[in-house]
């Protein structure tokens, strides 16, 4: 016999407060039901209590069954069985209690009609066993079986397993099997108990379309009850014929098709202990097939394709009949399919900013051992700007001035004008017109630049990533407070007309953006984490960061659109990706790539030697970043700066706070305009609104407000110092005025403890007082890449 030693209750347990609340509600209900003399009395709006002794022998046909959520039955010695149909109609039942009654048997499917049942109390009855099937599929929180004469058998092994796995408190009751006298043995000592063993034997030879396939399911185990096949995924793929019985079941698939691939064939078996099942997939070989679609313009151009075949075919692209060698600008990308049970694969041939040179015939060849297939498509990405092939010789034609001339020399005429000369003259005139237009634009842009150039502050609080970037044409730029209010930077900073076009900004529907929660706030407005649908073809939805514009003035809207145009142009793996804007309704939204680990400064601090001190009791990273990881971070920031420098853009506010960290230690340049609010101590306020990051600025920027690509190099040297100090503030021991004095007098930041001499040499190369003597960003990046690929052996003897 099995006995229950009650240490609370057997099985799952609700929280003490919840269980106490249930008991309290039942006690209060007793007062209301005291006057009820029927077999079952209502308790509250959806409860029923049946406690009159010996008046109930079945639970069928209870009054108000459709609305019941709690049913309490007690002292019913004639209630001995709970069958399949007894609880029919009680679909809303959450709690069932049958105690101190004569319940001897509960059918395996007794709770088929009560899928929401979560609290089951069958204590103090006459139960000798309870099948695992009885509670299968229920989300129980409480199961109470104490006070029942449970027999020690394999049928109760499932209960002991729950006890061993500590499922919601089952361990609180010890189940033991009775031996001789008062000796009790643990239920687990019965080694003959176990779920069935199921194995499917597959055909040894390869299967092709049209073949017949025979599968055999072998079942082993004690007290086997039933077994069968699950073939729901195979409908329509073949004719199925079952054969045999326990312990060996057969299945014949007649005239199989390629649709059988990736479909599960499942065999299951049950006994008193539990259920076991195993699934296999039959691989049907068939030749490759391919389909190509027309080129579509997305973020990159895409030539969509679909390929099928088993085994999966290899792919090769051809362009105008020649093998196409893939690069980082032209490459194959497969799309993740939501369907995992098909052999067909979908993808794109991605082309990054293709030109007329890429116009032509594209052919995809797919091949596997059973055959090959090819498909071709013509793609045109851009009209040819030339009326002739620049590789062909220019034809020369002659038109005589005097039609009466007797000379017929086809080689040369004195007054004839060759076509090549006409082309040259035309190009020269076009160049002159272009230069004239350029000067006009230069003059106008100097007067009405909308990228913060004519603002009263060098770095106003509302400036974001784009507001800190400027296109340089004639070397460095300087900005005095009076210039900021006046004519701007005539002759020094211009907006390149070819970079800004409203048509290139991607517009996102507001209905596709679902805001989740706020990430931060700046003077411009707020930044939210959001889900964006239909943004990328290979993802139904993705997390993004959404910047909402607070100000609604016309100037703010114009700045918004100009910033969007600029950000659309900046496309680099180490610049935070800008997806587009939403201008439907209000507020105006910008959608950026979401970088899950936040800004680089916080990331460095949380992964540094002082992480525990700064965490304030929160979980911290297991250890500080290693030398190789620090070099990788620095190299990525440098790569982004090389890209900006190649476009002649000046950042002006480069710092770790304005870099973001994503999954896999991917670092990108970009901020959402929040850094001046979050890191206000990093900025030095001059006058009313001007805030300068003086600790990152070179002498010429502090003294003369001169910003250039060389001033960005200086700032990068400070960023490198931040990285190797795990996010410390430059000149942290000095006030702003003291820091200005040190920088302008030529003092340098000391070498960090974790910094190898080679890296510090790069920092010093960035901090040369004369801008022309500083390392270029390209050289800095090359040196860091070399160090990252082979990190130097460096031992911090002081640490």
UniProtKB/Swiss-Prot annotation:
Site feature location: Interaction with PLCG1: 794
Sequence ranges of the LRR repeats: 90-113, 116-137
Broad class of where this protein is predominantly found: membrane
SUPFAM superfamilies membership: Immunoglobulin, L domain-like, Protein kinase-like (PK-like)
Extracellular topological domain: 33-418
EC number: 2.7.10.1
Annotated glycosylation sites: 67, 121, 190, 204, 255, 264, 320, 325, 341, 361, 404
GO CC terms: axon; cell surface; cytoplasm; dendrite; early endosome; early endosome membrane; Golgi membrane; late endosome
Tissue-by-tissue expression: Isoform Trka-II is primarily expressed in neuronal cells; isoform Trka-I is found in non-neuronal tissues.
GO MF assignments: ATP binding; GPI-linked ephrin receptor activity; identical protein binding; kinase binding; nerve growth factor binding; nerve growth factor receptor activity; neurotrophin binding; neurotrophin p75 receptor binding
Catalytic residues (UniProt): 653
Subunit structure: Exists in a dynamic equilibrium between monomeric (low affinity) and dimeric (high affinity) structures. Homodimerization is induced by binding of a NGF dimer. Found in a complex, at least composed of KIDINS220, MAGI2, NTRK1 and RAPGEF2; the complex is mainly formed at late endosomes in a nerve growth factor (NGF)-dependent manner. Interacts with RAPGEF2; the interaction is strengthened after NGF stimulation. Interacts with SQSTM1; bridges NTRK1 to NGFR.
Family: Belongs to the protein kinase superfamily. Tyr protein kinase family. Insulin receptor subfamily.
Physiological role: Receptor tyrosine kinase involved in the development and the maturation of the central and peripheral nervous systems through regulation of proliferation, differentiation and survival of sympathetic and nervous neurons. High affinity receptor for NGF which is its primary ligand. Can also bind and be activated by NTF3/neurotrophin-3. However, NTF3 only supports axonal extension through NTRK1 but has no effect on neuron survival. Upon dimeric NGF ligand-binding, undergoes homodimerization, autophosphorylation and activation.
Protein name: High affinity nerve growth factor receptor
Organism, scientific name: Rattus norvegicus
Lineage: Eukaryota, Metazoa, Chordata, Craniata, Vertebrata
Gene, per the UniProt record: Ntrk1
């Amino acid at each position: 016999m099995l006995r229950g030693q009650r240490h609370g209750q057997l099985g799952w347990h609700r929280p003490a407060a919840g269980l106490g609340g249930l008991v309290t509600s039942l006690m209060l209900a007793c007062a209301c039901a005291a006057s009820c003399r029927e077999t079952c009395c209502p308790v509250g709006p959806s409860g029923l209590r049946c406690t009159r002794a010996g008046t109930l022998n079945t639970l069928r046909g209870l009054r108000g069954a459709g609305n019941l959520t709690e049913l309490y039955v007690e002292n019913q010695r004639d209630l001995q069985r709970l069958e399949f149909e007894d609880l029919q109609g009680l679909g809303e039942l959450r709690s069932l209690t049958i105690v101190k009654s004569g319940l001897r048997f509960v059918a395996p499917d007794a709770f088929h009609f009560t899928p929401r049942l979560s609290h089951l109390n069958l204590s103090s009855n006459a139960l000798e066993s309870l099948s695992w099937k009885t509670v299968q599929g229920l989300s129980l929180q409480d199961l109470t079986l104490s006070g029942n004469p449970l027999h020690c058998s394999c049928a109760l092994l499932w209960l002991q397993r729950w006890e061993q796995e500590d499922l919601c408190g089952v361990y609180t009751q010890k189940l033991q099997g009775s031996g001789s006298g008062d000796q009790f043995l643990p239920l687990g000592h019965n080694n003959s108990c176990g779920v069935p063993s199921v194995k499917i034997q597959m055909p040894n030879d390869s299967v092709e379309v049209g073949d017949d396939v025979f599968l055999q399911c072998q079942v082993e185990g004690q007290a086997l009850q039933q077994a069968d096949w699950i073939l729901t995924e195979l409908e329509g793929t073949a004719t199925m014929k079952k054969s045999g019985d326990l312990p060996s079941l057969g299945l014949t698939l007649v005239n199989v098709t390629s649709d059988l691939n990736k479909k599960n064939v499942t065999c299951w078996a049950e006994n008193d202990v539990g259920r076991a099942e195993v699934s296999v997939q039959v691989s049907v070989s068939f030749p490759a097939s391919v389909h190509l679609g027309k080129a579509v313009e997305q973020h990159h151009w895409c030539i969509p394709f679909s390929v099928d075949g088993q085994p999966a075919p290899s792919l090769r692209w051809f362009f105008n009949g020649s093998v196409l060698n893939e690069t980082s600008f032209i490459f194959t990308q497969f799309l993740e399919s939501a369907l995992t049970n098909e052999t067909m694969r979908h993808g794109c041939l991605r082309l990054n900013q293709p030109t007329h040179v890429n116009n032509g015939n594209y052919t995809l060849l797919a091949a596997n051992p059973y055959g090959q297939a090819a498909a071709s498509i013509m793609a045109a990405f851009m009209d040819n700007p030339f009326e002739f092939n620049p590789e062909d010789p220019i034809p020369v034609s002659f038109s005589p001035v005097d039609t009466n001339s007797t000379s017929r020399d086809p080689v040369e005429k004195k007054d004839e004008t060759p076509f090549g000369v006409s082309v040259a003259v035309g190009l020269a005139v076009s160049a002159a017109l272009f230069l004239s237009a350029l000067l006009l634009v230069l003059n106008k842009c100097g007067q009405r630049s909308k990228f913060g150039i004519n603002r009263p502050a060098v770095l106003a609080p509302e400036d974001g990533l784009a507001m800190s970037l400027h296109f340089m044409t004639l070397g460095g730029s300087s900005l005095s407070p009076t210039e900021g209010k006046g004519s701007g930077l005539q002759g020094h900073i211009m907006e390149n007309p070819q970079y800004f076009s409203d048509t290139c900004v991607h517009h996102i529907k507001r209905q596709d953006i679902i805001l989740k929660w706020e990430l931060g706030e700046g003077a411009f407005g707020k930044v939210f984490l959001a889900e964006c649908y239909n943004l990328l073809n290979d993802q139904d939805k993705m997390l993004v960061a959404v910047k909402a514009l607070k100000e609604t003035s016309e100037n703010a809207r114009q700045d918004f659109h100009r910033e969007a145009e600029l950000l659309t142009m900046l496309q680099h793996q180490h610049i935070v990706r800008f997806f587009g804007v939403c201008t439907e309704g209000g507020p105006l939204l910008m959608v950026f790539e979401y970088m899950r680990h936040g800004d680089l400064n916080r990331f460095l601090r949380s992964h540094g030697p002082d992480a525990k001190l700064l965490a304030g009791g929160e979980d911290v990273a297991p250890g500080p970043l290693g030398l190789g990881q620090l070099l990788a971070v620095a190299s990525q920031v440098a790569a982004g700066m090389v890209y900006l420098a190649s476009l002649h853009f000046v950042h002006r506010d480069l710092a770790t706070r304005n870099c973001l960290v994503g999954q896999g230690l991917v670092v990108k340049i970009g901020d959402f305009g929040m850094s001046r609010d979050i890191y206000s101590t990093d900025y030095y306020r001059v006058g009313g609104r001007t805030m300068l990051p003086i600790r990152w600025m070179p002498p010429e920027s502090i003294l003369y407000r001169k910003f250039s690509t060389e001033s960005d190099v200086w700032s990068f040297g400070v960023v490198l110092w931040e990285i190797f100090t795990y996010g410390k503030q430059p000149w942290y021991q000095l006030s702003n005025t003291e820091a200005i004095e040190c920088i302008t007098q030529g003092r340098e930041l000391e070498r960090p403890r974790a910094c190898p001499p080679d890296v510090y040499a790069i920092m010093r190369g960035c901090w040369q007082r004369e801008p022309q003597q500083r390392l270029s960003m390209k050289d800095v990046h090359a040196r860091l890449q070399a160090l990252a690929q082979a990190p130097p052996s460096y031992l911090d003897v002081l640490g």
